[in-house]
Amino acid sequence: LAQYYLNNKRQRTQINESIRNFFAPRKDINPTHTHMLLSALPIRSYWTTNYDRLIEKTFELRGVSCRAHFSDENLSISTDNAQIILHKMHGDVENPNSAIIAKEDYEKYDDTHEMMLAKFKGEMCSKTFLFLGYSFSDPNIHHILARIRKVFDKHAKQHYCIMKRVTKRENGKKTKDYEYKLIKQNHQILDFKNYGVNVILVDDYSEINDILSEIKRRVYMKNVFICGAYEDETVNKDKIAQLGTTLATWLVERGFKIFSG
C-alpha cells in the first residue's frame, strides 16, 4: 500500500506524518509484561523492526541505559556507556523519512543499510536469537539466513522462534481455511528448520510470558550472591579466606556465577 501511494504521489510526506503520529510515544501506552520480562534477561543486544519507542521506555523504567541504532549513519555512535544496544532495522519514529515501509525501501536495503546487515549477520553467526512476533516476511532476513546456511551448512548457530499453533477454532469460531493454514504452517516450520530456526508452537500468545519467565528462572538460578561480615577479632582470617576460595572454586566448576557485596 505504501508503495502504491509513492507511485501515485512521488513523495512520502504523508507517510512520514502517519508514522510519526501513529507511533509517537504516548503516556497511556506502556510496556507490556512481555517487554518487562525480556528486559529482565541478561541480554545486551536487541533487534526489532518496530518504529515505536516501547523498548526504550521499558529500559528507562528499569533505570537501564539504552542506545538505539536505526541507520548506518548512527551505527558508529559510541556505545561504551550504554548497557543495552537496540538495533531498529526498519527505522525509528523520530526519523520517519528513513523508515523501511515501501517495496522500494526493501529493494534498496542492501545498499542503504549495508553496515546494519553486516552487524546482524555477524550476531546471527555468533549468538542465539529468539524471534518473537516476527513473521519472517522480510526478504532481507531470508537472504541472510540462506547465506549463513550456505557458509556454515549444518554447523550454523541454532535459533528459536515462537509461533501460535493453527487450531480448528479461533475465539470460539471455526477457523477459515483451517486445512490450508495448517499445511502452510507445517511447511513453514520445516523451512525455518532448514535455516537453523527451531519453531516453538504455543496455543495462546499468553504462553510466551510463561516461556520467558521459565527462561528467566533458569538463568538466574545459576547466580549466587555471597556476602558476610565478622566483628570478632579472634576469628581465624586464614580459615575464612580458605573457605571462601574453596566455596568459590566449587561454584565456578559447576557453572554458577558469583556475585558479592
Feature map (PLM): residue ranges:
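A charged nuclease-like catalytic/ligand-binding cleft shared by nucleic-acid processing domains
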Residues: 12-17, 84-104, 109
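SIR2/sirtuin-family catalytic core signature
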Residues: 27, 33, 38-42, 62-67, ...
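Basic, glycine-enriched DNA-binding surface that flanks or lies within the catalytic cores of DNA
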Residues: 37, 45, 49, 54, ...
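Short loop/turn segments at strand-loop or loop-helix junctions that form parts
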Residues: 90-91, 163-166, 225-231
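Active-site glycine-rich loop that binds ribose-phosphate moieties when present
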Residues: 103-119, 144
